[in-house]
Each structure stands twice: as structure tokens, then as C-alpha cells.
Amino acid sequence: KDSLVNQLSDYFAPYNGQNQSEQVAAVIVPHAGYVYSGSVAAAAFARINPESRFEHIFLIGPSHHVYMDGASANDRFLYYRTPLGKVPVDVNLCRKLMTDCSYITCNPAAHTEEHCLEVQLPFIQYWFKNTAPIVPIIIGTQSLPVIEKIAKALAPYFNEKNLFVISSDF
């Protein structure tokens, strides 16, 4: 735990005292190994006021192991655990998204070996004073019509109450 905290502290150090905004609705962050992408992820999160009190943090990333004709919202875990502690999952909101959009299901295999969301969690835990429940979503398709339907289901939540963290390979 101490090693991770020290590493995160080093990544965030250049941004201490910089202007932050509570108006940030979304960040796009890389999910490579921390040695390659940690400073970039910290730069993105550091633009957000650490005192922000989001209702939810939507974590969205690509599937690296499982193809799906849509997305998987993980309603099988009550929380994710990192060396910094537990991050709660809003399983009820995950289930609501599945009810609202036929292209959002729960495919446990999509989350089992996936790293793109988990690598963001320590940054969230370290930076924010209050960690909001997460809504973990793995995207398994690049079909534009399907992505548009998923986006339509997520659109009501894209507001000042929530933060969207898009985990990317680039």
C-alpha cells in the first residue's frame, strides 16, 4: 500500500496547487502500466477538484478479452478492492442500465481478466476525498449504431452530479 501511495503522490506532485474545476464532466485516461501512463492519468484527474462530491463515477473502457455485441455493466460485485481499500459499485444503477438498454448486459467474463477499469481505481481513491460509487462498464463492440444506443442510455447521467472516466488505449 505504501509503495502505491508514494507512486501516486509522485504522479500528482507536479499538479499540486494548480487550478482545478468542479465543472469537469469527463476525463479520458490511459490504462497502460503506471510507469508508462501514471503521470498522464494524474494530470487528467488533477484538473478536478478533489473535494468534488459526485453521485457516481462511470468507468468505461474497452474489452481486451471478450467480444460482445454491446457492453457489460458489472452488477455482480458489491465493490472492487485495491491496496487503498474498497470502491463500492452501484449494482442497482448497473441493473437499471441493463433494463433501459438491451445492448447493456452483464457478462462476467468481460470483467474477470480486464484491467482497463481497475487501473483507474487507485487514482480515484487517492485523489478524491470522497469516493463515489462506481458504475463499471466494459464496451465490447465498435459498431456505431450500438455505441449510439449505449450512449443514449448513459446520456441522462452525463451531468454535473456524475463523473465519466473513459479508459483508453491511446
Annotated model-derived regions:
Residues 1-170:
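Active-site histidine-anchored catalytic micro-motif
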